């Protein structure tokens, strides 16, 4: 996902014009600096909300639906470098959230609160998903309701399995 984001940024910058990136494209200051020297401008969500008629790269972490809606309203062209694995996960969560059934369920995401990917996942549920960072937090879930558990793509499988076992 990260390699794709960098390649897309390089391609766009080679074509000339201004390219913004919503958040640091990677967690590597040297690479961020190199792309900045090529012309990439890193912005935050506040900057993005006030941007109009621009081209913005979305990094591998993914974004909530609200970001795409703002882009549409503000005539922002999106260069989407969201990792395909993250996109599939977002789609699964959104389907589960929007599926109308009689079951009273809660969507739970094992991940780091505030992490860009997790914000994108929670956004699929209009902010209703519950985020847990460790097994202890799973103990606070409402076990009278059905639980649908998902994980941030970069989290430990071992810890995820412990949470699954606890919930069972």
Indicate where each model-derived feature is located.
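The feature marks the mature, well-folded catalytic cores of soluble enzymes
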Residues: 2-168
């Amino acid at each position: 996902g990260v390699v794709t984001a960098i390649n897309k940024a390089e391609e766009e910058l080679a074509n000339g014009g201004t390219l913004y990136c919503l958040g640091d494209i990677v967690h590597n200051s040297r690479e961020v600096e190199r792309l900045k020297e090529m012309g990439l401008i890193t912005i935050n969500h506040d900057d993005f909300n006030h941007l109009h008629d621009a081209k913005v790269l979305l990094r591998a972490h993914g974004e909530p639906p609200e970001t795409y809606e703002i882009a549409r309203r503000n005539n922002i062209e999106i260069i989407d470098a969201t990792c395909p694995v993250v996109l599939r996960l977002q789609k699964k969560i959104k389907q589960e959230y929007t599926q109308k059934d009689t079951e009273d369920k809660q969507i739970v995401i094992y991940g780091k609160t505030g992490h860009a990917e997790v914000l994108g996942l929670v956004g699929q549920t209009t902010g209703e998903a519950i985020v847990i960072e460790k097994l202890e937090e799973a103990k606070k879930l409402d076990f009278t309701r059905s639980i649908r558990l998902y994980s941030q793509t970069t989290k430990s499988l071992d810890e995820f399995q412990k949470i699954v076992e606890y919930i069972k």
